[in-house]
């Protein structure tokens, strides 16, 4: 095993020891809303319950600064962030001030923890790629395995969480796959796209990619209908006809909303600026989580209606309520941005700035925040600031 993986394990062991010695047994898990986030939450929930912790979960689409502030104003608590949080480790440290034990199990871009009570358990810090070699669920799985070897029976969730990473399973994800195969939780099969993995412990054997899609639908489209909780239940107890019917209903709901949005854009076109093309969905996706606008933008970026050299931006209204948490103090809109293929190549050649640089900056200018990758990013801005945001992004995109 590579030394960087061993270094990462050693740091995890310290966090596990701290958790075991902590006097409090109530834990709040804050997790992301996609399949990786649901799998991560399910792993740590089950692992902690086996150690007699009481566990609550909150599913977040974005980690709002005001949520960090409210949670970490408390004292003597245990907070575990899964598949979310690393980008905000510095902010979490500032607000936590060693008052609570905080573990961040994530694989996204990170800021560094400045608080010894905030453990930023991210493979990226140790030179392991979170984009290619380690999903959030894999990070969480190895944490659970160090906590108790019994948790190796959760290795299949690491594989489902890894489905979002393109290409063959590699790196730390492959180490988890070895465990899953050894335990008979996963079966290898061939598909026309190459190697496939069938998950054999959730009822009927299904491809890990199909289960990943189903969980993401529950977490995003079903965000306001108890979808994330239902998704965690699927992760641990398997599929049944009732949940499959519910997933089918959500997929149809999204398909109708996507179709309606596409027809409107084909009829009216996108609003064109010098470097940005954009649309506002308003309440087209009402009742669904905001991840749906990102999925729609990804699809739209491949359509002929899109200018291949301009950043593509979609905006939708957001509900101020977060299930299991309460209401945000401000009204925001969700921003999703994608780059068409040609623009993506230009960014790769450093002829155009990456979204990961310009989108957060434009969001911050308009009362919000953002994060993401070079060709796909998202954020929020204050409601009413949409036009100013796209104008700011347009200027930044021309630099």
Where do the language-model regions lie?
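P-loop NTPase catalytic phosphate-binding loop
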Residues: 220
């Amino acid at each position: 095993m590579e030394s960087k993986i061993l270094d990462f394990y050693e740091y995890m062991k310290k966090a596990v020891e701290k958790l075991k010695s902590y006097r409090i047994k109530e834990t709040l898990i804050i997790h992301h809303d996609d399949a990786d986030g649901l799998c991560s939450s399910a792993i740590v929930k089950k692992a902690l319950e086996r150690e007699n912790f009481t566990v609550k979960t909150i599913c977040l689409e974005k980690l709002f600064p005001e949520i960090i502030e409210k949670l970490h104003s408390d004292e003597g608590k245990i907070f575990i962030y899964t598949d979310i949080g690393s980008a905000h480790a510095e902010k979490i440290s500032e607000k936590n001030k060693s008052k609570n034990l905080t573990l961040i199990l994530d694989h996204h871009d990170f800021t560094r923890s400045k608080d010894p009570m905030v453990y930023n358990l991210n493979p990226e810090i140790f030179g392991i790629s979170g984009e290619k070699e380690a999903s959030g669920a894999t990070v969480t799985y190895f944490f659970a395995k160090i906590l108790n070897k019994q948790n190796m029976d959760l290795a299949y969730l690491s594989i489902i969480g890894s489905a979002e990473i393109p290409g063959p399973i590699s790196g730390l994800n492959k180490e988890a796959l070895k465990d899953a195969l050894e335990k008979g939780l996963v079966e290898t099969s061939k598909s026309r796209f190459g190697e496939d993995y069938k998950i054999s412990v959730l009822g009927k054997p299904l491809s890990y990619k199909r289960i990943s899609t189903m969980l993401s639908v529950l977490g995003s489209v079903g965000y306001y209908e108890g979808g994330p909780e239902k998704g965690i239940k699927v992760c641990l107890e398997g599929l049944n006809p009732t949940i499959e019917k519910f997933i089918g209903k959500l997929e149809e709901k999204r398909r109708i909303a996507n179709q309606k949005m596409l027809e409107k854009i084909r009829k009216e076109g996108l609003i064109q600026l010098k470097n940005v093309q954009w649309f506002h969905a308003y309440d087209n996706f009402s009742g669904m989580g905001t991840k749906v606008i990102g999925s729609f933008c990804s699809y739209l970026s491949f359509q002929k209606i899109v200018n291949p050299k301009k950043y593509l931006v979609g905006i939708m209204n957001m509900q101020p309520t977060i299930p299991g948490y309460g209401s945000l103090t401000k009204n925001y809109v969700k921003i999703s941005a994608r780059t068409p293929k040609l623009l993506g190549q230009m960014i790769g050649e450093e002829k155009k700035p990456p979204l990961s640089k310009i989108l957060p900056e434009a969001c911050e200018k308009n009362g919000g925040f953002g994060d993401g990758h070079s060709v796909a990013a998202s954020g929020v801005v204050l409601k009413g600031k949409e036009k100013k945001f796209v104008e700011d992004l347009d200027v930044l995109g021309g630099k």
